[in-house]
Design a protein with these regions (language model features):
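Short, compositionally stereotyped local motifs that mark structural "simplifiers"
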Residues: 429-515
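Short proline/glycine-enriched turn/loop motifs at strand-loop junctions of beta-rich domains
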Residues: 403-404, 453-460, 529-533, 577, ...
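Surface-exposed, short loops/turns at beta-strand junctions within beta-sandwich domains
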Residues: 482-490, 573-578, 658-660
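C-terminal outer-membrane/trafficking sorting elements
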Residues: 629-674
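Aromatic-rich carbohydrate-binding modules that target alpha-glucans
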Residues: 469-480, 527-575, 588-597
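Active-site-proximal helices and loops of the catalytic beta/alpha 8
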Residues: 23-39, 49-58, 68-70, 75-82, ...
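Aromatic- and acidic-residue-enriched carbohydrate-binding clefts of CAZyme catalytic domains
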Residues: 29-31, 72-104, 134-184
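Substrate-binding cleft of carbohydrate-active enzyme catalytic domains
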Residues: 95-131, 135-137
Length: 674
């Protein structure tokens, strides 16, 4: 008996240790990932902005890939792909505290955060100086001997010889990254630091998984080693290459990481008829019938992270047009979201077509499609392409093309979605109700189309809008009927078949028109010697310039708060996603601040004496100087202009005296509207 117990506990310990190792990407995974940023998306990817979207993502998005969250050596806005600090998580997208709050909010909504891990290369102060960082009482620092000996086409070695320092004896294992030091992953010191860093991201910050940047630069064996050390569940590598090379890399990791399915993306792009920001041909949707991708292969589709566009392909500017889709974005997403692999939706697509993409995701999940589902082709013509994917709950047919009416499935399918160049059909075996408008917030009343997906042709739909479960006695409509949603409500719609209600679907709608409001941005330059009395504000957002052209608008309005002089300017927030980017300056070719994201609420900035690349940095002191979020400590205000505005307790400036009851700030005092 004692021997049997020892064997039993040994087996338990062995299984526990096995479970600690990384699995690369879960099998039969039904989740959908969102790339939570695009290039220079400082407006929309602030941690505070993303946190406000968590409730809206719930039930649709399961993973969000965040931009690199570590602090860089630059103090201006940067995307983070030249990392400097590992354990300092204050970035252009927000503070570490805001990041932790975001990840906690995601987790509360069933969403995991994927860290952008950039460890192929690292930035330095000068040529060779890496920061010394202390975490949990241990100091971590890379040295010059952790740099690959042939870094930057051996220009680093030339500089090392001049400076009398040594590099690693090992060459780079892959593609070189110019402008940063390529790290030697064979170095024990490098391995120790990166493992500590990844454990910090996962166990302390709270990330669920990792997206490894530029994995062509170092061996996949290291990714396997790092993932084993952290026991991470989700890992995806950016191996931008031909399909077989991506497969080889996955094998090199011992299948302990997934990879982005670049060739899936190119199949979609080619079918649409675009390349390098040019329309090169008419669409030929039959080109989607390709086996040159990870998604088609039953052995590797578990590790396929499919996508149709990302930050390295989107249109950035006329000088960096890159390789965007340009057209048929909805059809591309419809195809991706109906196929196996784990789809990764691009943030600009999500923002532009959220309602449609939500419905696509809902259909995918209703059918039970996973990253390992099987599919068959139903039609492959120039103007029409159709695939049938078998989920673990039902089957879903996606039809895309310029003539989607060319394919109609049999009577065992019901059409549930239709849009520009795409259609979705769900097998009637699903036996469910369906609504074509997903849960979410809407700015105006709308009509919702209800569909009975049932093998019983006489099935009806019953629904309620008060959140109660529908019964046979509830409001009843025929399949294909439209109902009006004219206020915030919870719609529950069920399938009424042979007197029984089944297949109930729930939709939570918030109907609320956006009300434009005004924020104020304040600037104080007392710390900067000889700044003078001239102050220009230059502001912009994705909609364009919010002030006069550079150097902006000359600001003469000031307020004195507790003896401190503040220049200020009001900005109208016209949509829920709008923000304000701002630079303070003295005029053309004179002193100026770094650029800052002021968000969409009142902000106070002190221009400091510290500089970055010749530009003055600013300290956000809103918490000290803003109209109070509490009721105490209201500052004494002396205006050079009359301020008769009304403010909410969060500092939001209103256009007029509020009609809604509540507590407000008016002329520096708390006022209660009853």
């Amino acid at each position: 008996m004692i021997i049997m117990k020892k064997i039993y506990f040994t087996l338990i310990a062995l299984l526990a240790s096995i479970n600690m190792f990384a699995q690369g990407w879960p099998a039969n995974y039904s989740g959908v990932m969102l790339q939570g940023f695009s290039w220079d998306s400082y407006d929309y990817s602030q941690w505070t902005v993303l946190e406000k979207q968590a409730d809206d993502m719930k039930g649709f998005i399961d993973l969000v890939w965040l931009p690199q969250s570590g602090k860089c050596i630059e103090t201006t806005q940067v995307m983070g792909y030249k990392p400097y600090y590992y354990f300092n998580q204050n970035s252009s997208f927000g503070t570490e505290a805001e990041l932790r709050s975001l990840i906690a909010k995601f987790k509360a909504n069933g969403i995991g955060a994927i860290a952008d891990v950039v460890v192929n290369h690292r930035n330095t102060d000068g040529w060779f100086t890496f920061p010394a960082e202390t975490y949990n009482g241990v100091t971590y620092q890379m040295s010059s001997t952790d740099i690959c000996k042939n870094d930057d086409n051996e220009s680093t070695a030339t500089q090392a010889k001049k400076d009398g320092v040594s590099l690693s004896n090992n060459s780079d294992e892959g593609t070189d990254f110019g402008g940063c030091r390529d790290i030697d992953h064979k170095s024990e010191n490098v391995q120790k630091i990166i493992k500590a860093y990844l454990k910090f991201l996962k166990e302390d910050i709270g990330y669920t998984g990792f997206r490894y940047d530029m994995v062509k630069g170092f061996s996949g064996t290291h990714v396997a080693d790092y993932n084993d050390a952290t026991g991470v569940e989700f890992s995806v590598g950016e191996y931008w290459d031909v399909n077989q090379s991506i497969i080889n890399w996955i094998n090199k990791t011992n299948k302990k990481s997934a990879a982005f399915d670049f060739q899936f993306r190119y199949n979609v792009r080619d079918a649409i008829g675009v390349k390098d920001n040019n329309i090169v041909s008419s669409p030929n949707w039959s080109k989607l019938k390709r086996d040159y991708n990870l998604m088609h292969d039953p052995t590797y589709r578990q590790y396929a992270i499919t996508f149709v566009e990302n930050h390295d392909m989107q249109y950035r500017s006329k000088d960096e047009p890159l390789d965007p889709l340009k057209r048929d974005t909805l059809a591309a997403n419809a195809y991706m979201l109906a196929m196996p692999g784990t789809p990764c939706v691009f943030q600009p697509h999500w923002r532009a077509y959220k309602q449609e993409i939500k419905s696509m995701i809902e259909a995918r999940k209703l059918a039970g499609i996973t990253n390992m589902s099987n599919y068959t082709n139903k039609m492959a013509q120039t103007a029409c392409f159709a695939n049938e994917t078998t989920g673990n709950k039902a089957k879903l047919i996606v039809v895309v093309g310029n003539n989607t009416k060319a394919y109609t499935p049999g009577t065992d399918y019901a059409q549930i979605l239709e849009g520009y160049h795409y259609r979705y059909y769900l097998s009637k075996s699903a036996e469910t109700a369906w609504c074509n408008i997903p849960s979410g917030e809407y700015e105006a009343v709308f009509k919702a189309k209800l569909t009975a997906v049932s093998q019983n042709s006489n099935a009806k739909l019953v629904y309620t809008t008060d959140g109660t479960a529908p019964t046979a006695k509830s409001k009843q409509v025929a399949t294909g009927s439209n109902i009006n949603i004219d206020e915030t409500c919870t719609l529950k719609v069920g399938l009424l078949s042979n007197g029984t209600v089944t297949g109930i679907r729930t939709y939570n709608y918030t109907v609320k028109a956006f009300e434009p409001y005004t924020i104020t941005v304040y600037a104080n330059a007392d710390q900067v010697t000889n700044w003078g009395s001239v102050m220009y504000f230059y502001a912009w957002n994705t909609s364009g310039e919010l002030t006069e052209k550079w150097p902006g608008t000359a600001v003469t309005a000031t307020k004195t708060l507790n003896g401190k002089k503040w220049y200020y300017m009001d900005f109208k927030i016209k949509s829920k996603d709008a923000i304000v980017n701002i630079i303070f300056n003295q005029g053309k070719d004179k002193k100026q601040s770094v650029d800052m994201n002021a968000g969409n609420s009142t902000k106070f900035y002190e221009i400091t004496t510290a500089q970055s690349n010749g530009k003055y940095t600013c300290k956000d002191v809103t918490a000290t100087w803003a109209p109070p979020t509490g009721i105490t400590g209201t500052p004494t205000i002396s205006n050079t202009t009359t301020d008769n505005a009304w403010y909410t307790l969060s500092g939001m400036k209103l256009g007029k005296k509020p009609a809604k009851s509540g507590v407000y700030i008016h002329q520096g005092k708390k006022v209660i509207i009853r």
